[in-house]
Amino acid sequence: MERQVLLSEPEEAAALYRGLSRQPALSAACLGPEVTTQYGGQYRTVHTEWTQRDLERMENIRFCRQYLVFHDGDSVVFAGPAGNSVETRGELLSRESPSGTMKAVLRKAGGTGPGEEKQFLEVWEKNRKLKSFNLSALEKHGPVYEDDCFGCLSWSHSETHLLYVAEKKRPKAESFFQTKALDVSASDDEIARLKKPDQAIKGDQFVFYEDWGENMVSKSIPVLCVLDVESGNISVLEGVPENVSPGQAFWAPGDAGVVFVGWWHEPFRLGIRFCTNRRSALYYVDLIGGKCELLSDDSLAVSSPRLSPDQCRIVYLQYPSLIPHHQCSQLCLYDWYTKVTSVVVDVVPRQLGENFSGIYCSLLPLGCWSADSQRVVFDSAQRSRQDLFAVDTQVGTVTSLTAGGSGGSWKLLTIDQDLMVAQFSTPSLPPTLKVGFLPSAGKEQSVLWVSLEEAEPIPDIHWGIRVLQPPPEQENVQYAGLDFEAILLQPGSPPDKTQVPMVVMPHGGPHSSFVTAWMLFPAMLCKMGFAVLLVNYRGSTGFGQDSILSLPGNVGHQDVKDVQFAVEQVLQEEHFDASHVALMGGSHGGFISCHLIGQYPETYRACVARNPVINIASMLGSTDIPDWCVVEAGFPFSSDCLPDLSVWAEMLDKSPIRYIPQVKTPLLLMLGQEDRRVPFKQGMEYYRALKTRNVPVRLLLYPKSTHALSEVEVESDSFMNAVLWLRTHLGS
């Protein structure tokens, strides 16, 4: 019987990719001020920002669209778009002022060559640009941080000043042999200025500046900066402790100072992207005296402090352990006036029944407080879904706002005056934009959602969640009784299920998870006729802290066994073609995939690995997160000592490279040459070992790409090559 897979021509796959990749993704939303019409009606504008792949320009474009939401104070009466979308070129950050009358925009302009790109901070009011400041020309600091780790753009409550984070201005450096020609017609003062020894430091042009790792290259020493909107004067704040790097800052009550998160950078910086375990604390620096005050425990890790509307309390996430790299967090509350800190929501060791399984988001939304400053709203993974929750900060109760829905996943974009803006999607439904009012306390489950922007469901994609219990011989002795889940996508109504091939995708991390949200690659594969199995093995987030802690020391074993067990169970229950199973994984998902083709070579006909971890031992000295190597191998990390021989041996023993002699599955490797997280030499090590043994292997090396391989040109090329690899080795 002919196999029911849409792989007969590469052009068909390219056309399908071109169509599905046009689905835009929501990146941000903000709410305008309340407006009352002459007839007494009330409405607010919703400003949304989106991104979309542009295959003609080979870049991600950003655009905005506005909507009007008419309401009666408790529910939405009418909502709809206000005009078409507009591309926003060059915008790095933007923020509405507290009153909504002004908007600050950080914009890049100029060329793309070194030193050609400039940054401008603009202030807009109504229908005009009120101010524009050339930050690059002012030379008060280096480039402004626009990332979500350190970056911020915060209006003072008085709307007279703007707070942001930028790279500290570096001293000029020149060669020992640099000479300057003196103008004989210059004045004595000008000649003296040119001769000043402090104009440039000789011999420092090649001094190494340590940065914050993957996706944070050139970000080394952040400083807090304040712009006086009226005068244009920029001040770099003093008083920040020298041993920490500041970020995520906002104005304290009364504008008397600034609250910020400070990350320790001694004795050296570790990669911070996707690592919520970096030692950090909450600080307050007084603008008048320059005194800096510690507001939280300084031995833990914190993130995303958010000031309540009444300016009395600060809520933030706190991670009670510096290992592993991501985990269940506490929700903490700091009272500004009593100086008392309390834990509102604690770490959840294990989910009981359908109860709350803990907080796993890495950042709280910028707008997360209810109007009465009593409740906090956020989204978090709960097993294989992502739901919205409201927490009563007085009593600590957690209530789901989206439980009992259709099984998809939610993301909160913002909440203001109890009006929530959220995103909803499923594996077969691209993101839709919704608004709804937060009900009064005790009635949170009765949110009435109204769609602002609907998306068309993608036909012929069926999906569901499978709960899996490891067999007794695979139980974790210390953390017994843990289950895990997998999300299964399959083509709608195939003529013969036994002819359907399956692609298995373990996630990276390892402490992350798949949720039932829109994902381009799985949807593409499913539309081509593949069943796609997304496995949340033990160690994934969303299943309780015990599940996360069960994996360090057991990588290469527990995670691999879980994925293999999931594959065998699904093949047995669904009767897919067991002779046509392939693997596709990136980072730790690539680590698991390469383990599987070594430990279970008879199961898999093809494998695609993106920036995989191959040899934990050899990665230790080159990655931006050496602590990951040690901790996941099962040992405590210390920055002041090297592992002993037994630790090196254990790291090697838990690595896919150990199983090279058994590998016979054809492998496609995709590596980013600028990857700081899993340096591309990891994949090269595996490539050479397979070539030596005549195993079919192909290597794609993307020169300017990083760990995620997410650049539009790279992403599209890697997908098409993956499809062709599957076509070649699974057969069409």
From Swiss-Prot:
Modified sites of kind N-acetylmethionine: 1
Enzyme class: hydrolase
Tissue specificity statement from the Swiss-Prot or TrEMBL entry: Expressed in erythrocytes (at protein level).
Regulation: Homotetramerization is required for activity. Tetramerization results in the formation of a gated channel which is involved in substrate selection and substrate access to the catalytic sites.
Reaction it catalyzes: Cleavage of an N-acetyl or N-formyl amino acid from the N-terminus of a polypeptide
Keywords, ordered alphabetically: Acetylation, Cytoplasm, Hydrolase, Phosphoprotein
Major place of residence: cytoplasm
An example Gene Ontology molecular-function term: serine-type endopeptidase activity
Annotated positions of the Phosphoserine modification: 185, 187
Gene3D superfamilies xref list: alpha/beta hydrolase, TolB, C-terminal domain
Location of this chain's protein in the cell: Cytoplasm
Pfam families: APEH_N, Peptidase_S9
UniProt family annotation: Belongs to the peptidase S9C family.
Functional summary from the UniProt entry: This enzyme catalyzes the hydrolysis of the N-terminal peptide bond of an N-acetylated peptide to generate an N-acetylated amino acid and a peptide with a free N-terminus. It preferentially cleaves off Ac-Ala, Ac-Met and Ac-Ser. Also, involved in the degradation of oxidized and glycated proteins.
UniProt name for this protein: Acylamino-acid-releasing enzyme
Organism expressing this protein natively: Homo sapiens
Phylogenetic placement of the source organism: Eukaryota, Metazoa, Chordata, Craniata, Vertebrata
